[in-house]
Amino acid sequence: YKIADAAGISLPKDAKVIGLKVDAIGSAEILCKEIMSPVVILKSYDTFENAVAMAKQNMVEAGGVGHTGGVFTDNMDHVLYASERIPVSRLLINQPTPDAWGPATNGLAPAVSEGCGTWGNNIISENVNYTHMINISRTAMPLDVEVRTPAEVFGDK
């Protein structure tokens, strides 16, 4: 209720979230940045393709490229369309995006942190978990192999 009070908004006592309608997206709207509170922004769209384009624009302009996105749909064509276009390391379908940390219900690795890949200037684009905290030493011996030339590997041009 502190957020609502600070904004001069009165809420019912059983309110769980504040929904705010925005007219703009991306860098034109401060509320399109990551929000770490029970506030949700709402933006209408004409088609699913339009919604995906807005999501991508928002990620690029307001921050979040490489992080996590969410789509609520039962249409597998929509899932594939969004997966191919929204630049995120994790796209959650029909689940809240805080589940990106990897609960048993979605198959993502349980995380202590979330990597955003080179999109977000990170070294990895997966959930950082205990396997990333273990030092592994690798011993390499020479192999008896013929090394191909760059021309053989990549062609003449």
Predicted stretch roles:
Residues 9-157:
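Conserved C-terminal structural/oligomerization subdomain of aldehyde/semialdehyde dehydrogenase
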Residues 1-8:
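A conserved active-site cap/scaffold subdomain adjacent to cofactor or substrate pockets
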